[in-house]
Amino acid sequence: MGINEIIMYIMMFFMLIAAVDRILSQFGGSARFLGKLGKSIEGSGGQFEEGFMAMGALGLAMVGMTALAPVLAHLLGPVIIPLYEMLGANPSMFAGTLLACDMGGFFLAKELAGGDVAAWMYSGLILGSMMGPTIVFSIPVALGIIEPTDRRWLALGVLAGIVTIPISCIAGGLVAMYSGVEINGQPVEFTFALILMNMIPVIIVAVLVALGLKFIPEKMINGFQIFAKFLVALITIGLAAAVIKFLLGWELIPGLDPIFMAPGDQPGEVMRAIEVIGSISCVLLGAYPMVLLLTRWFEKPLMRVGNLLKINNMAAGGMVATLANNIPMFGMMKQMDTRGKVINCAFSVSAAFALGDHLGFAAANMNAMIFPMIVGKLVGGVTVIGVAMLLVPKDENVPAPANNEAEAHS
């Protein structure tokens, strides 16, 4: 049994715990039947529900872009392919640079890879779980949640995170190379040359983004927000066209990928968008409860880590929450000290969703890449903490307001 299978078994163990809690909650709660053990698992049933209900949000983000992937590859290929080949990189790296793996990056990378499966995995699941999500999801979402005064710390944190993405990708690529990734029984050949050469365009983009965040942070962040709005519009067009094609047979956009199984698809080998989303939700049934319970059971050690980093408890809790989803962390930012805000924003660039949506996506689409993806994301998360700590102005590490601390513990 490989490490990827072990991870899946662990998540399914937590899924069963959460299922038991959800059942017992109908009859008075787990604590009533299981005592202290029941009290320690209470609430996991709610996370079980959250995991399955994520299907709707995932569908809105994924289906349209998945359907559009071959169309976009056809339109962008004449520009992207020669440009990336000139740099010595595979064109699929374009997809993971701008799109999250679960927002079309994985499928667009496949279309642009030209049959190079290793480059597709490298871009679609490793790079596409770090840089792409930051640009199209994390920054726009954060701007709608955080206080305007915290935008500066968001920019500083993202700056630190973007700079360390190449390190994260190389770490994930090396794990993939040495762990012997196989897909449908065929080995996927990751090489040093592939891992390093494909970082050239990523480093160029990372440097440009970092310079922009350093010298014109407001304009850069607003630019990401505008890009995200156009992306939502594009995804909606793709979704509407794909649904009309499925229900009425009208091909409004030629070349759309089917969103349900099509004639000739082999069950278990070809997964279309709707089936992928269902598979991700099944994984999240265990992933969300796992994060909740591990956070609860190991609260004291986690708080000690926060003390070592010299951040308050709310900031330490935000880092743990980020491993599943960074939206709760952004909501907690106003209750963090300045150092904690920068570290959390930096940490979320690589580490966000490592035990949540991205884990579910990798498990549903290419479970051989679960371990390399998680290692890459966590290496990035750890590495970026040091960079973020260097970037925080020592004279501006303002503690969170006292009333916010009180609210946090009430």
Task: Describe the predicted segments one by one.
Residues 71-90, 251-260:
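Interfacial/capping segments of alpha-helical transmembrane domains
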Residues 71, 75-83, 293-308, 386, ...:
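Membrane-spanning helices that line or support transport/gating and their immediate boundary helices
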Residues 68-77, 170, 245, 353-368, ...:
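Juxtamembrane "helix exit" motif at the C-terminal ends of alpha-helical transmembrane segments
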Residues 70-75, 109-116, 174-178, 250:
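Transmembrane alpha-helix boundary signature
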Residues 43-54, 81-86, 229, 300-311:
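Short amphipathic alpha-helical coupling elements at transmembrane boundaries
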Residues 1-64, 123-128, 135-286, 368-410:
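Signature of multi-pass transmembrane helix bundles
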Residues 87-167, 312-366:
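Alpha-helical membrane segments and immediately flanking helix-loop junctions
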Residues 287-288, 301-307, 314-319:
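Intrinsically disordered, low-complexity segments enriched in Gly and acidic/Ser/Thr residues
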